[in-house]
């Protein structure tokens, strides 16, 4: 990307991205093109991170291990659903992922947990996500029973209108009362250590830029 184009992109992203400074946006753009590699920009060719490349970043950099959650995080970043994360989606996505307000993070986490995109988190969705995050005990005859119990306990705590599923309003109320419930169904945000390490590595003088 030529300097003029890069400057224009940096300015436009900085204007619309309240959590990053111009310098930080520039660093994230640099990192994006480092990760994508040398790709010639051509008409009709999408330059971006595909699902595997992005999941690799989530795993290696932010320690995520749950395939289902990583897949949903990818979809959360890939706003236009073209199967690829563009440089704009990368910067906007990281803005919430790394530095979002509680409101932004609640909206993001709810979208991640709403597996089928119907604006509710159903019992089935809770079951699938909690099943992945719990370790099975070899002695358990029916490990699913414990997960079903956990789903019922979670609903009791979070389902404020008692309709057997979680709307965003239910989820928001529960999280505002107890912020630990933000990632109730699995880690989909970076832990503080990964976040500070990532930022320390990326937000430095571009002249001494290394890949993360």
UniProtKB/Swiss-Prot annotation:
The organism's superkingdom is given as Eukaryota
Where does this protein hold Ca(2+) 2?
114, 116, 118, 125
GO BP of this protein:
cilium movement; outer dynein arm assembly; regulation of cilium movement; regulation of flagellated sperm motility; regulation of signal transduction
* Gene Ontology CC terms: cilium; outer dynein arm docking complex; sperm flagellum
Residues that bind Ca(2+) 3 = 159, 161, 163, 165, 170
**ATP-binding as a keyword?**
no
Against InterPro entries, the record matches this protein to: EF-hand-dom_pair, EF_Hand_1_Ca_BS, EF_hand_dom, Recoverin
What is an example of a Pfam family matching this protein?
Answer: EF-hand_7
Q: Where in the numbering of this chain does the EF-hand domain appear? A: 65-100, 101-136, 146-181
CDD domains referenced in this protein's UniProt entry, alphabetically = EFh
Molecular-function annotations in GO: calcium ion binding
- Per the record's keyword annotation, is Nucleotide-binding included, yes or no? no
* Record keywords, A-Z: Calcium, Cell projection, Cilium, Cytoplasm, Cytoskeleton, Flagellum, Metal-binding, Repeat
Q: Could you give the subunit structure recorded for this chain? A: Component of the outer dynein arm-docking complex along with ODAD1, ODAD2, ODAD3 and ODAD4.
Name the job this protein performs.
Component of the outer dynein arm-docking complex (ODA-DC) that mediates outer dynein arms (ODA) binding onto the doublet microtubule. Seems to regulate the assembly of both ODAs and their axonemal docking complex onto ciliary microtubules. Regulates ciliary and flagellar motility and is required for cilia-driven determination of body laterality.
Q: What is the designated name of this protein?
A: Calaxin
**Record organism:** Bos taurus (Bovine)
């Amino acid at each position: 990307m030529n300097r003029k184009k890069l400057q224009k992109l940096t300015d436009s992203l900085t204007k619309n991205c309240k959590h990053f400074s111009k310098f930080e946006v520039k660093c994230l753009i640099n990192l994006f093109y480092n990760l994508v590699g040398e790709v010639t920009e051509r008409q009709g060719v999408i330059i971006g991170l595909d699902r595997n490349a992005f999941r690799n970043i989530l795993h290696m950099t932010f320690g995520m291990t749950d395939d289902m959650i990583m897949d949903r995080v990818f979809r959360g970043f890939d706003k236009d659903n073209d199967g690829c994360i563009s440089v704009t989606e990368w910067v906007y996505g990281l803005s919430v992922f790394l530095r979002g307000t509680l409101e932004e993070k609640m909206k993001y986490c709810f979208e991640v947990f709403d597996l089928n995109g119907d604006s509710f988190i159903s019992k089935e969705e809770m079951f699938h996500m909690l099943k992945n995050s719990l370790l099975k005990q070899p002695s358990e005859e029916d490990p699913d029973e414990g997960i079903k119990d956990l789903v019922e306990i979670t609903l009791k705590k979070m389902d404020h209108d008692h309709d057997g599923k979680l709307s965003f309003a239910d989820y928001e109320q529960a999280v505002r009362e107890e912020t630990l419930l933000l990632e109730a169904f699995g880690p989909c945000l970076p832990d503080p250590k990964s976040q500070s390490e990532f930022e320390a590595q990326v937000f430095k003088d571009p002249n001494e830029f290394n890949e993360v």
